[in-house]
Amino acid sequence: MLPLLQNGDLYSYLISHTNIPIATRLTWAVEIVQGLAHLHARDVIWTDPHLCNVLLTDDYHVVLCDFGMSIYNAPYYYKFAGGPPAIYLCPLGYYGESPRRVDIFGLGVILFVLLSERLPFHKDLKPSVHKQFEVLQEHHRICLNGGSFDTLSPSLHPYFGEIVAKCFNIKYQSADVLLTELQAAFSKWWEDNIEVNNFSTLYLSARRD
C-alpha cells in the first residue's frame, strides 16, 4: 500500500505557492530526472510524464507516480496508445526516434516549468485546453519545419538552456546522460549563486519543520 502524501502533486503545489526559490525547484528537477533514469535503466518507459504525476513527499522531496501506461522493453517503433496532457506530448514528427522520446520531451516541458514558472509558449501555469493544443501544434511545426522552442530566462539559459533544448530536440537517448549534465549544470549554478541557495536551504528547512 502506498502512503498518502498530504502535499499532493507538484503541479498543484506550484500553482498555490508562488514563492518557491529557484534552488528548491532545481533540486526537484534533479530528483525527477533521477527517478526517470531509474526507470530507463530498467527498460521502462514512463509514458505519462507531467507535473500532476509527480508527488511531493512530507519532507519535500519528489517522487514519480502513475505507471498505468508505462511500457517495459518497448520495441523501437512502438506506437503509444496514450500519453500526457497535450502540452507535454512529444510531437509526431519525432516518430522513428527512440521510444524513450515521449519521456524525454515531456521531461523537457517539466524542466522548463520548474525553471520558468510557466509552461512553454504561455504566460503562466494555467493554459486552457485550447491553448494546450495550440502549443502542441507549435511544437509539431517546429519539429517538422525547424525553428526555436521556447527558451529560458537570460539568467538561467547559460546554465540550463542547452539541456532543455536537447530534451525538446530529442538529443538524449535516455535520462542517464541528461541526469549527469543537469547535476553538473546545477553545481555550476550553485557555485555562482551562493546567496540565493542559502535562502532556498532556509525555505526547505522551514517547510520540513
Model region roles, listed by residue range:
Residues 1-23:
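Conserved structural core of kinase catalytic domains
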Residues 39-57:
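Catalytic-loop of the protein kinase fold
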Residues 52-95:
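Activation segment/activation loop of eukaryotic-type protein kinase catalytic domains
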Residues 91-155:
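Conserved C-lobe activation region of Hanks-type protein kinase-like domains
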Residues 155-167:
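Conserved C-terminal C-lobe helix
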Residues 169-193:
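Terminal C-lobe "cap" of eukaryotic-type protein kinase domains
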Residues 191-209:
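Regulatory extensions appended to serine/threonine kinase catalytic cores
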